[in-house]
Amino acid sequence: MKLFIIILMLCTTLSAIDLNLPSSAIQNATSGLVLILPSPSAAKSNPACSFTGIETSATYLFSMEDLPLYNFHVQYKYHDFGFHVGSSFLAHPLYKESNSMFTLNYNYNEFTLGSSIRYLYNKVEEYHEDSALLVDMGLLWENGNISTGLSVRNVTHSLFLEEQLPIVYLWESCFSITQKSKLSIGLEKETNFDFAFKIAGRYDVHKVLTILSSYQYKPDRIGVGAIFNLKDFSLCYSVRTHQYLSLNHYISLNYAF
């Protein structure tokens, strides 16, 4: 199966470039929904999300040790402005991809508008090496116990090797059910794919423990995770299923300041 994935990347290169992968263990547990538990990496999914702190994450994609994915995100807020810098790196001896981004968002009353500039670099050994600049946009509305966000990745319709990179639309609404629980629902639409429905739940068992779970329809995937909080630090471990591949284990360390 590992060999099949690598061959697929080499033979259908553009379909494997700029994959909409979770950028943290939290998003792995919530199927990519970010409003239910904000973190610095949430800006990658919706540039309007603002959460001050530092977050680093790592995973072996679908439990394949030859496909490590590393993420690093920093976010800072100054008055009504939010600043975010993030990077991800997917490494394999034959396939390398990095994604670096800078995000700026602005909050006015109940609304936040954000935009990201991303630099995408991709190299397939002895086949191609290229890069592209992309722009993402996001909008967030928050009112009491309800928040709603809409984001669009690659609003510039940027090209890679003269072919258009994927455009991803994500809508999400989050509701506070009780003081200790939240529920998020979302719809995701990517170029050349059907709509994907997502639902995620959060329950704060204790001030030191939070449980996350999610379900995604088309394709069917289930995610679960646990967050251990210690003052300003939090450690998240999550696992997510796949219809055809092995489980995707993820770990993240977050420091809030």
Predicted regions and their residues:
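Sec-dependent N-terminal signal peptides
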Residues: 3-14
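Subset of outer-membrane beta-barrel
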Residues: 17-257
